Amino acid sequence: YFIKDGSGFVLSSERDGWNHIYSVNIASGKQLQLTRGGWDVIAVNGIDEANQRVIFTAAKSDPKNQDVLAVPLNGKGVMQLSPLGGTNDPEFSTGFRYFINTRSTLNTPPVITLHNSKGKQIKLLKDNTKLAATVKEYGLVTKEFFTLTTDQGIELNGWMMKPPAFDSRQKYPVFMTQYSGPNSNEVLDQWGGRDQ
């Protein structure tokens, strides 16, 4: 994304081993890392010119989450715009004055809300209480997160669904799927719809 005055642009790069945001000054070629830490930027949504900041989504609070965040063009402090936890999927107005956020968690259907540029919720647009009640009525089992540690000490996230009336003293058959590819987080704190 180019800065409107033509002085530079922002991009994401894995230069430090994590996907982070950098600004580049066109005249000097100087690069400034705007975000840093042991987490990945998922997407750059654009530049909020009025507030001189970059709006983006990232797995900052937890690798299973997707947060909506902002960072000033000078890189001084990341601001949380969405509620913590779960998966937040924003749609921004022109100029980034408002955004509609669709947020869900592993066992909670999407809730759609309207927020101002500082992240304050202005209005609840859709709460999906009817869907949540219907799911509860069917008595479906809930998903649970777990973490495995490999022989190399790497922690891997997973989720499981146990049979109804699960008894830990019993043995059950297991159906397992896995993904071994790079750069794709398949274990998300997000409503799964058909997987519920």
Where are these regions (language model features)?
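Short flexible coil/turn linkers enriched for glycine and charged/polar residues
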Residues: 15, 62-63, 75, 106, ...
